[in-house]
Structures are given as structure tokens and as C-alpha cells.
Amino acid sequence: MATTKSFLILIVMILATTSSTFASLEEMVTVLSIDGGGIKGIIPGTILEFLEGQLQKMDNNADARLADYFDVIGGTSTGGLLTAMITTPNENNRPFAAANEIVPFYFEHGPHIFNSSTGQFFGPKYDGKYLMQVLQEKLGETRVHQALTEVAISSFDIKTNKPVIFTKSNLAKSPELDAKMYDICYSAAAAPTYFPPHYFATNTINGDKYEFNLVDGAVATVADPALLSVSVATRRAQEDPAFASIRSLNYKKMLLLSLGTGTTSEFDKTHTAEETAKWGALQWMLVIQQMTEAASSYMTDYYLSTVFQDLHSQNNYLRVQENALTGTTTKADDASEANMELLAQVGENLLKKPVSKDNPETYEEALKRFAKLLSDRKKLRANKASY
């Protein structure tokens, strides 16, 4: 009798724990963040293709898209372009691009976007005309409010000297931010010295003209927009019941996937104090943006990994980054076919690498684990909605 009673107690405990786990997963807020990096967007593009493929297999649904699983998708520079590609609706109100179309997009359009023959000696390296043309062609007249999930795309206004963050949740208070997606994507990609800044105008809530003079959001030290994307999610928690579980910065209730575009540790791409002691403004100008982007990405990852670890939720945060780019793969604008092939291979090889020295789990295994959580959470929410 005592044995039977103990067995029943054990069953109840297991069921209670399982129920609690499901409830916890259902409450999770999911965030995807994609770094800037020009043509190196091929690397996160490869990772996104793998992740979406896993979700399609798990849910037995070839039409499954990343926007169906993430509450917030954020990006800077080329990451902003990827964000738009996987969240902007087509005529069927589905993302106009599947993840497996991202890398082919770079191969088709990259050589024309980064065409050195269009550059000017006393001006931006590229005129940006083809980039704008292809953005208008792909994104049409869609605006921020039409995105299929919350987005966070960053840029920097050189007239007001302030960052500009385009999100759906800001539109009620700031309707002037409901810009066309092609204007936003060009602005996010308009890195100083590479592309001209972008001017466009919208209307305020009173109907007044509102002007933007924008460059790449990485200028606002958000080359890694993960923290920005998390901030958008936590701000929504104050108003949206679907985000309520992360009020008071409860990162235990958040799943965060952050995709990098690669960094380098090559000696000839870094510098010593002795070497730079006599540098002037021109020499510093050529490398300062790269340095600040690398520093901001490192600090963002350091902060987030520390916070998640302190909350014993380190498995809720995954940073996918290649830290050993070499040769031409370090360049944001080398769109030669040979280099793009190398970047695609970097992405494929990255899947087989361990997450860190302390974590032997490969990125492929970690992404499969993430995909399972995303899939289960979506099913739990769908079941709840059906009642």
C-alpha cells in the first residue's frame, strides 16, 4: 500500500513538473537578432536556412517561416535587410522570402550592389543606386506596420544626432516611424564611406512633414542589435499581454538567438600601440568604425551572456559567431563569387564547431535544441488559442 501511495505521489510530482514546464515554455518570449556586416550577411543567412529547415521538419510544414516563431526580429545594416526579407509580407501575407532564398539573394545582387566601378574618389565608395532599386523591387510599398511580427531595425539620424529605431510597437505614439521598408533597409545599410546617407520624409500624427537623414545603425554602436531587440521586447511587455512574462527584465522567460557576421583575429587586421602612436586622422578614420563595431558586439555578448548565466538560464541565449575569419572573408564589400562561396562555406563549417571552449555542444546541436523549443512553444500557444 505504501509503495502504491509513493508511486502515485511520484506520478503527481512528474505531472506537476511537466505541466509547469509546458506553462513556462508557453510564456516564453522569443527574440532573433542579426548583426550587420555587408556581404558577410551570407554567414547568418546560412544559419537561418538551417534553422528554418529544422522547424519545417519538426512541424511537418514546408511553409513554416521564421516569422511564425519569433516575437521580435531585429537587425542592423545587412541584418536589417535580412529582417525585412523574412518579415515583410507578400501578396499572400506570408514572408516574401524563405530562409533558403537569402544566400542566393546575395549571390545574385551582391556583385551589383558592391560594384567598384560606381564608386567616386571624393565620395562614397558605392552610389547605392542598385541597392535602392532592388530594395524597391523586392519590398514594394510595404510599411513597418505590415511586418508579420515585431521588428527592430536601427539607423542613425545625422541631422538630429540620434538613433532611430523602426518598430511596430512605436507607431501608436510615433506614426512618422511607419516608413516604407525599402527606405528603412537602405538607411540601415548606408554605412559611411560605403553608401550615401538616405533622406526621406513621412508624416507626423498631426499630418506635418517629418524628415529623416539616416545612415547605418552601427554608427550608434549597435553592430550587434541583440540588446536593442531585447529592449524592444521588454518595452512591449508593459503594454502587450503576450510579452507580460518578461516584465521586470525576467530573462528566464526569454529565448534569444543572436547571429553574427564574423570577426577576425588575424594579426594584419589588428594593430599595436607602437604602430598607431603616430597615426593621424585619416589613418584612424579607416579603422575606427571596424574597431567600434567589434567592441560593441563583444560588450553586448558579454553583458547578455553574463545576465543569462546569473539567472541560471544560459541555455536560453545562443550567440552564433565565427571569430576566425581570414583573408577576403573579413571584408564587408568583397562580393566576388569566390569570396561569397567562401562565406557560405564559413556558415556551413560554423554549424559543426563547438559553441565555446566551455561548451562542447556544436552550433548545429544548439540550433536543433532551439528549434525544438520554438516548435513546442508554437504548438502550445496554438492549442491554447483553440480552446
Curated annotation (Swiss-Prot):
<keyword id="KW-0175">Coiled coil</keyword>
<keyword id="KW-0611">Plant defense</keyword>
<feature type="active site" description="Nucleophile">
    <location>
        <position position="77"/>
    </location>
</feature>
<dbReference type="InterPro" id="IPR016035">
    <property type="entry name" value="Acyl_Trfase/lysoPLipase"/>
</dbReference>
<keyword id="KW-0378">Hydrolase</keyword>
<dbReference type="GO" id="GO:0047372">
    <property type="term" value="F:monoacylglycerol lipase activity"/>
</dbReference>
<dbReference type="GO" id="GO:0005773">
    <property type="term" value="C:vacuole"/>
</dbReference>
<feature type="coiled-coil region">
    <location>
        <begin position="361"/>
        <end position="385"/>
    </location>
</feature>
<dbReference type="GO" id="GO:0045735">
    <property type="term" value="F:nutrient reservoir activity"/>
</dbReference>
<keyword id="KW-0325">Glycoprotein</keyword>
<dbReference type="InterPro" id="IPR002641">
    <property type="entry name" value="PNPLA_dom"/>
</dbReference>
<protein>
    <recommendedName>
        <fullName>Patatin group A-2</fullName>
        <ecNumber>3.1.1.-</ecNumber>
    </recommendedName>
</protein>
<dbReference type="GO" id="GO:0006952">
    <property type="term" value="P:defense response"/>
</dbReference>
<feature type="glycosylation site" description="N-linked (GlcNAc...) asparagine">
    <location>
        <position position="115"/>
    </location>
</feature>
<feature type="short sequence motif" description="GXGXXG">
    <location>
        <begin position="36"/>
        <end position="41"/>
    </location>
</feature>
<dbReference type="GO" id="GO:0016042">
    <property type="term" value="P:lipid catabolic process"/>
</dbReference>
<feature type="short sequence motif" description="GXSXG">
    <location>
        <begin position="75"/>
        <end position="79"/>
    </location>
</feature>
<feature type="domain" description="PNPLA">
    <location>
        <begin position="32"/>
        <end position="230"/>
    </location>
</feature>
<feature type="active site" description="Proton acceptor">
    <location>
        <position position="216"/>
    </location>
</feature>
<comment type="similarity">
    <text>Belongs to the patatin family.</text>
</comment>
<keyword id="KW-0926">Vacuole</keyword>
<keyword id="KW-0443">Lipid metabolism</keyword>
<keyword id="KW-0442">Lipid degradation</keyword>
<dbReference type="Pfam" id="PF01734">
    <property type="entry name" value="Patatin"/>
</dbReference>
<comment type="function">
    <text>Probable lipolytic acyl hydrolase (LAH), an activity which is thought to be involved in the response of tubers to pathogens.</text>
</comment>
<dbReference type="GO" id="GO:0004620">
    <property type="term" value="F:phospholipase activity"/>
</dbReference>
<feature type="short sequence motif" description="DGA/G">
    <location>
        <begin position="216"/>
        <end position="218"/>
    </location>
</feature>
<keyword id="KW-0732">Signal</keyword>
<feature type="signal peptide">
    <location>
        <begin position="1"/>
        <end position="23"/>
    </location>
</feature>
<keyword id="KW-0758">Storage protein</keyword>
